[in-house]
Amino acid sequence: MDSSKVPVKLAKVIKVLGRTGSRGGVTQVRVEFMDDTSRSIIRNVKGPVREDDILVLLESEREARRLR
């Protein structure tokens, strides 16, 4: 697959909501799209992440379920 033709969206982490996953290896965050700052969604992120990080989202429509 040619990665130069995959549309990506840039999103900025505005709030870290908490840890999830069986061992806490996934972090749930609220992100705001760089091109449309009025739109924000919740995503699960694997690996280290903190506020003001920029994420490259290959799939921008999928939203994570909130933690209980």
Swiss-Prot record:
Major location category of this protein: cytoplasm
SS bond list: none
PROSITE patterns (UniProt xref): RIBOSOMAL_S28E
Family the entry assigns: Belongs to the eukaryotic ribosomal protein eS28 family.
Function: Component of the ribosome, a large ribonucleoprotein complex responsible for the synthesis of proteins in the cell. The small ribosomal subunit (SSU) binds messenger RNAs (mRNAs) and translates the encoded message by selecting cognate aminoacyl-transfer RNA (tRNA) molecules. The large subunit (LSU) contains the ribosomal catalytic site termed the peptidyl transferase center (PTC), which catalyzes the formation of peptide bonds, thereby polymerizing the amino acids delivered by tRNAs into a polypeptide chain.
Subunit structure: Component of the small ribosomal subunit (SSU). Mature yeast ribosomes consist of a small (40S) and a large (60S) subunit. The 40S small subunit contains 1 molecule of ribosomal RNA (18S rRNA) and at least 33 different proteins. The large 60S subunit contains 3 rRNA molecules (25S, 5.8S and 5S rRNA) and at least 46 different proteins.
Note: There are 2 genes for eS28 in S.pombe.
Protein name as it appears in the record: Small ribosomal subunit protein eS28B
Source species: Schizosaccharomyces pombe (strain 972 / ATCC 24843) (Fission yeast)
